[in-house]
């Protein structure tokens, strides 16, 4: 997939192939996070002992926002498939702009679900993938680092729904124009949903978790991530939020 060539990006098969590759990345990021405790203090704003000068927020927010500032300076967020968690902190790069062609509608950056992704990650995903409950102050930095990797992978996967939505819109402009004009959210949701594809995703994730989630050379080794939890995360979080992204993007598609 080449973002300088829109025809490769809006090809549904290319999009599906990219989403499959993202599965591997997300699984491995989850496995890395699974070595640590839940560490709730990392997510608590202004937690005693984790106060940060001139910053109001959690240790994770501080680490993530500062990383995004650095990444913005090297053009990360110029790429159409990257969505920042702190868009108001993004800085202009000193590198020459790549000048990607317009692939998505101009309002696409405004379709940003990262606040929701971060909230559901902390509240629902962390308890499923962590080694145990509780804090481990010696590993706060490592935990935040792994969390950022997980969040960025989830964000990219979920916001790829904008490319899915644009490709589907282009594939049947009359149908989607009618649905958008009538603000038929249910109709849009019905047309973007492919239950057979979703079922294949869950089946594939089950197999991947069975293979990746345990060390095959250690028969007594603990399973680092279970197929049940991985399927639950995709079925109840990743897929539904991706479809929310698609619907919001499509509802605005006829804007001038």
Curated annotation (Swiss-Prot):
Q: What is the effect of changing residue 76 to A?
A: Severely decreases tyrosine and tryptophan binding, resulting in loss of enzyme activity regulation by effectors
Please report the name of this protein according to its UniProt entry: Chorismate mutase
Q: Which amino acid positions bind L-tyrosine, per UniProt?
A: 75-76, 139, 141-142, 145
Please convey what the UniProt record notes about how activity depends on pH. Optimum pH isin the absence of effectors. Optimum pH is 7 in the presence of tryptophan. Optimum pH is 5 in the presence of tyrosine.
What Gene3D superfamilies does the entry give?
Chorismate mutase, AroQ class superfamily, eukaryotic (1.10.590.10)
Q: Which GO terms describe its molecular function?
A: chorismate mutase activity; L-tyrosine binding; tryptophan binding
Species per Swiss-Prot/TrEMBL record: Saccharomyces cerevisiae (strain ATCC 204508 / S288c) (Baker's yeast)
Q: What taxonomic lineage is listed for the species of origin?
A: Eukaryota, Fungi, Dikarya, Ascomycota, Saccharomycotina
Function field: Catalyzes the Claisen rearrangement of chorismate to prephenate. Acts at the first branch point in the aromatic amino acid pathway where it steers biosynthesis towards phenylalanine and tyrosine, and away from tryptophan.
Q: Which residues bind L-tryptophan?
A: 138-139, 141-142
Q: Name one Pfam family in it.
A: CM_2
Q: How does it assemble?
A: Homodimer.
Q: How does activity depend on temperature?
A: Optimum temperature is <38 degrees Celsius.
UniProt catalytic activity: chorismate = prephenate
